């Protein structure tokens, strides 16, 4: 079992979280065209819905994307990339980095800009119906001894992470070639949240058909005609 990260911060609080939206996925199943996070859902890009729902739940917010397209800059939040040394290593190996690199980028950004925060909350850019009480529910998992990771069960990128894990995460990616989020999380103290009522709020949009279904869900119900 890996050595557990030492915690120097106080208990995680919703107001002390830095939000990190992971917008680096290629979205190949969506087909050619606009990158998946920028596909329109209603009249706005999918990622804009995630930012809107996550912003009130955190103290600050950043989007991780290696290509800062104008559609992302229009969100008016900081756009950061995966750490450069990780990108170079991935090119040498001919492998994709995956979401762990984005999580590390968020941790390192939070440590530079909010050194007393201690925690980040990650969310993928393709979950536009993100619950408005996600932070409160995840922080409710805190107990003694404190977990290092608070995660929604079966939704591994929806999680609260201690930034103290950054050094170990960097080693795991660079030295071990680790890519699976759950594998890294289970090395540390992990608490999982079984979302009440199932996973409906965490609809991941990966295909044009799922995007169409999400658009129908987003549309306001039409009033029934009277006869």
Regions inferred by a protein language model and the residue ranges of each:
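Short Lys/Arg-rich cationic patches that frequently serve as NLS/NoLS or arginine-rich RNA/DNA-binding motifs
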Residues: 1-9, 222-227
């Amino acid at each position: 079992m890996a050595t557990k990260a030492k915690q120097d911060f106080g208990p995680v609080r919703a107001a002390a979280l830095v939000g990190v939206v992971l917008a680096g996925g290629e979205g190949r199943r969506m087909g050619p065209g606009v990158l998946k996070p920028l596909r329109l859902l209603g009249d706005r890009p999918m990622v804009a819905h995630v930012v809107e729902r996550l912003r009130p739940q955190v103290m600050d917010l950043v989007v991780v994307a290696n290509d800062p397209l104008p559609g992302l800059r229009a969100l008016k939040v900081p756009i950061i990339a995966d750490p450069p040394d990780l990108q170079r290593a991935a090119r040498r190996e001919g492998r994709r980095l995956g979401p762990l690199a984005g999580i590390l980028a968020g941790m390192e950004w939070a440590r530079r800009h909010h050194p007393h925060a201690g925690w980040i909350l990650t969310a993928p850019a393709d979950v536009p119906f993100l619950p408005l009480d996600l932070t409160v529910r995840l922080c409710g998992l805190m107990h003694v001894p404190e977990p290092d990771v608070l995660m929604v069960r079966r939704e591994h990128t929806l999680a609260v992470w201690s930034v103290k894990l950054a050094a170990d995460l960097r080693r795991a990616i660079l030295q071990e070639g680790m890519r699976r989020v759950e594998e890294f999380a289970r090395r540390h103290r992990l608490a999982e949240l079984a979302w009440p009522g199932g996973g409906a709020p965490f609809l991941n949009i990966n295909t044009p058909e799922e995007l169409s279904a999400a658009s129908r869900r987003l549309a306001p119900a039409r009033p029934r005609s009277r006869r």
